[in-house]
Amino acid sequence: MELESILLPGIETKRPIVIAGPCSAETEEQVMDTAKQLAAKGQKIYRAGIWKPRTKPGGFEGIGVEGLAWLKEVKKETGMYVSTEVATAKHVYECLKAGIDILWVGARTTANPFAVQEIADALKGVDIPVLVKNPVNPDLELWIGALERINNAGLKRLGAIHRGFSSYDKKIYRNLPQWHIPIELRRRIPNLPIFCDPSHIGGKRELVAPLCQQAMDLNFDGLIVESHCNPDCAWSDASQQVTPDVLDYILNLLVIRTETQSTESLAQLRKQIDECDDNIIQELSKRMRVAREIGTYKKEHGITVLQAGRYNEILEKRGAQGEQCGMDSEFMKKIFEAIHEESVRQQMEIINK
């Protein structure tokens, strides 16, 4: 994927690049008040939702085109760049006409290739930064596919926004981070800037600060944070928005670590990791060899491949062993689920010969 820098004039290259503003543009006064407070804290890029794709009808679905005039006024009054979400070709045309500086594609839209293609077609011949949120479901290929569609339309100033993934289980997060997915995105497209959206991942303002720090520790390039002049009275997502003062406090507390060249001591530790990985692979190979022998025995004696009782016993015992060794039981469960799946696959090959 051929990419160019998304940075606009006057935006520093140091991490994090911050995009901040309310979830929704509600009134002209609210938009301007929030923008002026953020600008006073040194923020350069303003965000506000003009069209809001709500899960169910009846909620506030955005102020619409009227709000674009307010964003134009933000640019004029504060000098900030302005950004908003687009979900249709009509949104794109209205934003371009209003001089919006940065566009982003929302999670629900990213999940629909037809909608993404419509947006990509509307952007042909335009040079504007476009950020693409991850789809609501944890599908990396769908996320990359959306980026590729827009890139194929000729846009090179692209970035990704990690806002977490929808889950029925909302014990801690509104949307599960599943950090391994944006990490894999970074591995696949190393020069793609990645922003973290702690507001949508956490769903609660008290989670914004730790999520911002975690994103920085994972070498994310930027943050897109919902900030409102009066969060408790917000018309949408009130619980996850913070005031400009609180946002400034959070940003000032961030510890920004750098990627440095490996020192000799770090190189030695990594060598130990490599040796451990080699040992793991060798031991897994031995385990699969025994699993194949078991598969042969099952075939000869007419025994089914899947033995549910034995499988449950393995998961319980290995989970407990892992906890005793300082590892998370859920982590152990995932590992042995994957090992069991491969064992079953190899035994099925023997059974079906």
Predicted regions and their residues:
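Hydrophobic faces of well-ordered beta-strands that scaffold small-molecule active sites
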Residues: P16-P22, K44-A48, V82-T84, L103-V105, ...
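Active-site mouth loops of central-metabolism enzymes
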Residues: P16-D33, P57-E61, M80-V86, G106-A107, ...
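Catalytic alpha/beta core domains of metabolic enzymes, predominantly
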Residues: I11, A115-Y249, L253, Q261-E264
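Glycine-rich, proline-tolerant flexible connector loops at the mouths of alpha/beta enzymes
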Residues: R47-E66, C229-A238, I294-V305
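Long, contiguous binding/interaction regions
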Residues: A35, A39, K44, I63-Y81
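Catalytic beta/alpha-barrel core
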Residues: I63, G79-V92, D101-V116, I128-L140, ...
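Domain-level signature for soluble enzymes in the chorismate/prephenate branch of the shikimate pathway
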Residues: E259-K353
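N-terminal amphipathic alpha-helix/helix-capping segment at the start of soluble metabolic enzymes
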Residues: M1-I19, E73
